C-alpha cells in the first residue's frame, strides 16, 4: 500500500532568490533518489518560505520491488584461456561481485559475448531506505552560496534549526549536523514562535496558517496581490505592475500584509525611473500611479507581520526612503551642473576591460561601426547615430548612475534633453541598452538600433578577440545576451545586413587590440551567433527545419528566419513525407554535385526529358519567387517536380555503364538538388 512522505527543513532566513530554485531542486533530487532506489511514487509537492523548505510526496511505495541485477564483466575472450579455464580477470570480477566464478554467466551483447554476474536482490522497505536517502538529499540541494555552522561537517544555505521527516505519519529517524529529525514544526518567528506537531501535509498547512505562516508561495503571491490592490485603492491610486517584484517579495515574507506610505511631492522632479528604481531595487516597494499612469508620491510595502500600530512601520519606511530619495535629488541637481558632452572626456579614465582599453576607446570603435551601419541601412540618420554613440556612455561617470547603476542610459537621455540635444538622439541614448532581458523591449528607432547593434557587436568581437569566450554556464560579459539582442533587433527591424560583413567591420576596428588571428576570431564569432540563432528559432519552429535552413546559410538573418518559417509551414502538407524522401534521395546521390552542363542529346529515356523540361520550367518560377522573398511559393513550385523525379527514378538507372550518360544524369539531378538547396538542406529533414 502506498504511503505519503513529508519533509520540512526549518532554518534561518534564506535569501529570496535561493528559495524557488531550492524548491525545484528538491523535486529533481527526490525523483533521482527514488528512481535510483526503484521506489515508485506519485505526485510531488514543494513549498517554501524564507524560513522553511517543504517536500511532500504522495503515493510512495512501501518497499522496493525485488530485482535481478546484472553486472557486466570482461569479454569472453579475456575471461577464459585456451583451455577454457577462468583467467585472473574472470576470477577478480567474481571476487568483486561476491560470488564464486562458477556462478558467472555468459551474456550475448551487440559487441559480443561477455561475462556477467546475475544476482537477485530482495527489495528493502522504503522506511529503511529513507534515513539514508533524506539526509543525502538535504546535503545535495545546490545553493549559489552555502555555509557551515559551529563545527559540523555539513553545508546549507543558512543554519538549520529543525527538521520534520514523516513517512506514513511516523518519524523518519536521522541526523543532519546537530539536528535530529522529528515531527514538530515551528510557527512565525515573531507572531507565533512556538512548536506544533505535524501529521501530514494537509495537517501541516492548517497548523501553519494557525501559526501565521503561509508555506505555499503561490498563495502568498495572491495574498500580496490582493493586499497591494486593497491598499492602493485606499490611497486613491493604482499599483504600477511589477511581476518580478511581486515574485521576489513573496519569498521575503511568511505572512504578508501591506501598508501605504508617502514621500514629499518635491521629489517628483527627479525622473520617474529613478524614483521607481530606488523604491523597487533598494526598498522592495511597489510604486503608485494615477489613472493616467503618472507617478504619485506614495508607495506600498509588504510587511512580514501584522502590527498593532501600522503607522510605526510606515514612518520607519518613509524615513528610510526619504534619505534614499534625498540622495537621488542631490545627484540629479549636481549632475545638471555639468553638460553630458563635457563628461565624455572622463571616459578616458574609465577602464572598460584591461585588454580592450577604456570606455572612451570602446565608444570610438562602436561609434564608427554604428556610422557604417547607418550609411548602409539608413544614411539619413548617420549624423544622429554618431552623436548618440558619442554621448551614450557619458552618464556612466555621473553621480546619479554611480549611486543607481540601474538607471544608466535613462539618465543619459534625461541629461541630453536637459542640455538641448535632439529628442531622437536623447531617446537613442536610452534605447541603446535594449533589450535588457530575453523577450524584452527593443529599440524603437533606427538611431537607437544602430547604436545598440554596434555597441553589442563591439562587446562580442572584443571579448572573442582577446580570448574572453563564454564556456558552459560562465558568461561574465553577458555575450550570449548581447548576441540574442543583436539577432532580435535585426529580425525586428528587418535589416538585410550580412552578418559576416558586420562581424568583419567590428574586428577591423579591433585589430590593434586583438591577441588572436582575426580570421580565427571571425569564424568563432559566427559559430557563436549560429548557435544563438538556432536556439532562438528552435523555440518557435521544428529543430530539423531550422538546421535544414541554417546549414545552407544564415548570413542574412532576416532571410534565414523567413526561409525557416516557410519550410515549417511547407512541411505541414499532407504529402510532405514522400516529398522529403524523394528530395533526400536526390541529395544522397549527388552529394558532391556535377558541374557539367546537361546535354539533351545524351538522354536515352523519355523520363530524362520530362524531368529536364520540368526543371527548366520550375527554375524560372522559383527564381521569380525568391526575388520576391516568397519562400513558401518557391517551395511549392519545387514540390511540383516530385512526379517527374519519381518517374525518373522508376525508369532510369542513374549509374549507367556509359560514363558520359552517367555524368549527364548526375548533372540533371545536381540541378534539382541545387534548386532546393538554395533554400534548405532537405537531407536534414525528418519525413
Curated annotation (Swiss-Prot):
Oligomer status and interactors: Tetramer of two alpha and two beta subunits.
GO CC annotations, alphabetized: cytosol
Superkingdom of this protein's organism: Bacteria
Gene Ontology MF: a single term: ATP binding
Gene symbol of the encoding locus: glyS
Protein's recorded name: Glycine--tRNA ligase beta subunit
GO biological process annotation, one example: arginyl-tRNA aminoacylation
Upper taxonomic lineage: Bacteria, Pseudomonadati, Thermodesulfobacteriota, Desulfuromonadia, Geobacterales
PANTHER family: GLYCINE--TRNA LIGASE, CHLOROPLASTIC_MITOCHONDRIAL 2, GLYCYL-TRNA SYNTHETASE
Amino acid at each position: 500500500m502506498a504511503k505519503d512522505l513529508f519533509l520540512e527543513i526549518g532554518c534561518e532566513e534564506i535569501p529570496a532568490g535561493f528559495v524557488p530554485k531550492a524548491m525545484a531542486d528538491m523535486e529533481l533530487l527526490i525523483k533521482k533518489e527514488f528512481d535510483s532506489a526503484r521506489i515508485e511514487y506519485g505526485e510531488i509537492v514543494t513549498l517554501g518560505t524564507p524560513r522553511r523548505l517543504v517536500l511532500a510526496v504522495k503515493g510512495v511505495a512501501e518497499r522496493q520491488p525485488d530485482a535481478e541485477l546484472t553486472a557486466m564483466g570482461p569479454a569472453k575472450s579475456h575471461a577464459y584461456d585456451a583451455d577454457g579455464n577462468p583467467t585472473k580477470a574472470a576470477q577478480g570480477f567474481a571476487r568483486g561481485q561476491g560470488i564464486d566464478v562458477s556462478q558467472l554467466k555468459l551474456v550475448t551483447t551487440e559487441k559480443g559475448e561477455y561475462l556477467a554476474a546475475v544476482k537477485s536482490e530482495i527489495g528493502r522497505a522504503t522506511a529503511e531506505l529513507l534515513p539514508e536517502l533524506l539526509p543525502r538529499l538535504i546535503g545535495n540541494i545546490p545553493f549559489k552560496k552555502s555555509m557551515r555552522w559551529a563545527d559540523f561537517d555539513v553545508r546549507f544555505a543558512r543554519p538549520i534549526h529543525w527538521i520534520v521527516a514523516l513517512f506514513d505519519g511516523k518519524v523518519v529517524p536521522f541526523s543532519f549536523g546537530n539536528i535530529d529529525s522529528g515531527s514538530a514544526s515551528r510557527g512565525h518567528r515573531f507572531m507565533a514562535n512556538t512548536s506544533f506537531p505535524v501529521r501530514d501535509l494537509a495537517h501541516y498547512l492548517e497548523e501553519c496558517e494557525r501559526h501565521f505562516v503561509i508555506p505555499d508561495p503561490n498563495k502568498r503571491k495572491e495574498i500580496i496581490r490582493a493586499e497591494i490592490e486593497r491598499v492602493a485603492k485606499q490611497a486613491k491610486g493604482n499599483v504600477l505592475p511589477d511581476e518580478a517584484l511581486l515574485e521576489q517579495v513573496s519569498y521575503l515574507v511568511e505572512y504578508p500584509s501591506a501598508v501605504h506610505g508617502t514621500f514629499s511631492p518635491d521629489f517628483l522632479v527627479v525622473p520617474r525611473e529613478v524614483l521607481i528604481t530606488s523604491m523597487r531595487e533598494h526598498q522592495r516597494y511597489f510604486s503608485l500611479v494615477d489613472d493616467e499612469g503618472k507617478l504619485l508620491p506614495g508607495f506600498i510595502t509588504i510587511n512580514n507581520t501584522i502590527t498593532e500600530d501600522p503607522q510605526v512601520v510606515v514612518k520607519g519606511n518613509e524615513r528610510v526612503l526619504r534619505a534614499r530619495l534625498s540622495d537621488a535629488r542631490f545627484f540629479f541637481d549636481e549632475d545638471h551642473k555639468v553638460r553630458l558632452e563635457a563628461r565624455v572626456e572622463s571616459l578616458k579614465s574609465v577602464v572598460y576591460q584591461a585588454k580592450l582599453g577604456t570606455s572612451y576607446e570602446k565608444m570610438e570603435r562602436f561609434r564608427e561601426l554604428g556610422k557604417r551601419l547607418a550609411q548602409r541601412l539608413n544614411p539619413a540618420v548617420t549624423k544622429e547615430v554618431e552623436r548618440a554613440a558619442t554621448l551614450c556612455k557619458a552618464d556612466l561617470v555621473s553621480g546619479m548612475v554611480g549611486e543607481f547603476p540601474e538607471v544608466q542610459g535613462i539618465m543619459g537621455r534625461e541629461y541630453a534633453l536637459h542640455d538641448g540635444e535632439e529628442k531622437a538622439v536623447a531617446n537613442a541614448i536610452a534605447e541603446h541598452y535594449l533589450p535588457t532581458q530575453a523577450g524584452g523591449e527593443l529599440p524603437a528607432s533606427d538611431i537607437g538600433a544602430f547604436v545598440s547593434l554596434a555597441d553589442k557587436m563591439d562587446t562580442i568581437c572584443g571579448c572573442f578577440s582577446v580570448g574572453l569566450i563564454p564556456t558552459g554556464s560562465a558568461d561574465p560579459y553577458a555575450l550570449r545576451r548581447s548576441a540574442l539582442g543583436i539577432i532580435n533587433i535585426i529580425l525586428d527591424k528587418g535589416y538585410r545586413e550580412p552578418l559576416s560583413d558586420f562581424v568583419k567591420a567590428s574586428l577591423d576596428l579591433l585589430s590593434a587590440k586583438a591577441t588572436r588571428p582575426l580570421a580565427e576570431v571571425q569564424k568563432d564569432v559566427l559559430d557563436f551567433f549560429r548557435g544563438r540563432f538556432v536556439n532562438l528559432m528552435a523555440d518557435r519552429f521544428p529543430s530539423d527545419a531550422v538546421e535544414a535552413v541554417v546549414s545552407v546559410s544564415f548570413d542574412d538573418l532576416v532571410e534565414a528566419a523567413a526561409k525557416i518559417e516557410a519550410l515549417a509551414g511547407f512541411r505541414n502538407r499532407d504529402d510532405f513525407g514522400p516529398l522529403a524522401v524523394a528530395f533526400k534521395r536526390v541529395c544522397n546521390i549527388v552529394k558532391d554535385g556535377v558541374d557539367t552542363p546537361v546535354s539533351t542529346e545524351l538522354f536515352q529515356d523519355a523520363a530524362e526529358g520530362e524531368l529536364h523540361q520540368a526543371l527548366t520550367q520550375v527554375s524560372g518560377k522559383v527564381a521569380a519567387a525568391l526575388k520576391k522573398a516568397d519562400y513558401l511559393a518557391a517551395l511549392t513550385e519545387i514540390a511540383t517536380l516530385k512526379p517527374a523525379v519519381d518517374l525518373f527514378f522508376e525508369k532510369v538507372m542513374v549509374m549507367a555503364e556509359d560514363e558520359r550518360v552517367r555524368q549527364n544524369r548526375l548533372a540533371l539531378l545536381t540541378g534539382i538538388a541545387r534548386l532546393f538547396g538554395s533554400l534548405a538542406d532537405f537531407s536534414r529533414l525528418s519525413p
